């Protein structure tokens, strides 16, 4: 005999399955994509660049650039990936409620996220032949500072991310580093000049330091 708990679990699984299917159909309107297992869920990829994540019945879309500020305005929270001993917050935003209530407002955001992920992938593919000083906003002086802080190359810089690179540099130089370096590192990570960073994006970065 099936218990009430088992029935409720089955209903929840069916609802999750329907939600995922509706989201996949929604994304199809914007272009072709393929699915791969990621973070215990399903990652959505366009031209080998991941732009969305579906896991535990929740829908997440990749942030980056001006999209972050739009997600913040809409009250979307970042995805927290629970590891064995730590919780890592990654740049994917929970859009489950937004998809359920205002799917039309999500179309342009998902489209921009897809484009951002493709551009970043192209940028990262070209990193093998680049030096730190070749990144936007970086010069020889900053390259030396970053290397002294334990970030040896472009690959490591992009892997660690602007916020943690800034933390390392700030720690190495006694906590007396100009906050502009955070903007410069964020621009270098995104492939843009630091003056193009919008104020909401800067505030979001500051909150992570």
Swiss-Prot record:
Q: What turns on expression? A: By chitin oligosaccharides, but not with polymeric chitin or chitin monomers.
Q: What happens biologically when this protein's gene is inactivated, per the record?
A: Defective in DNA transformation.
Kindly indicate whether the keyword Zinc belongs to this entry. Answer: no
Name the InterPro entries for this protein.
Answer: TfoX-like, TfoX-like_gammaprotbact, TfoX_C, TfoX_N
User: What domain of life?
Assistant: Bacteria
Disulphide-bonded residues: none
Entry-linked SUPFAM superfamilies:
YgaC/TfoX-N like (SSF159894)
The protein's role, per its UniProt record:
Required for DNA transformation jointly with TfoY (tfoX2).
Q: Which family does it belong to?
A: Belongs to the Sxy/TfoX family.
Q: What is this protein called?
A: DNA transformation protein TfoX1
- Source species, please? Aliivibrio fischeri (strain ATCC 700601 / ES114)
């Amino acid at each position: 005999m099936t218990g009430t708990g088992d029935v409720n679990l089955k209903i929840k699984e069916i609802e999750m399955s329907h939600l995922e299917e509706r989201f996949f159909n929604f994304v199809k309107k914007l272009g072709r994509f393929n699915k791969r297992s990621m973070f215990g869920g399903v990652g959505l990829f366009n031209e080998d660049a991941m732009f969305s994540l579906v896991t535990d019945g929740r829908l997440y879309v990749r942030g980056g650039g001006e999209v972050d500020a739009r997600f913040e305005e809409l009250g979307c929270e970042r995805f927290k990936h629970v590891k064995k001993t730590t919780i890592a917050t990654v740049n994917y935003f929970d859009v489950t409620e937004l998809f359920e209530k205002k799917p039309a407002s999500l179309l342009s955001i998902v489209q921009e996220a897809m484009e951002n992920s493709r551009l970043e992938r192209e940028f990262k593919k070209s990193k093998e032949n680049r030096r730190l000083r070749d990144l936007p906003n970086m010069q020889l002086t900053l390259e030396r500072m970053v290397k002294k802080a334990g970030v040896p190359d472009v690959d490591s810089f992009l892997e660690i991310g602007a916020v943690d690179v800034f933390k390392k540099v700030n720690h190495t130089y006694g906590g007396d580093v100009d906050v502009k370096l955070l903007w410069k590192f964020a621009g270098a990570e995104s492939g843009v000049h630091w003056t193009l960073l919008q104020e909401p994006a800067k505030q979001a970065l500051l909150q992570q330091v």
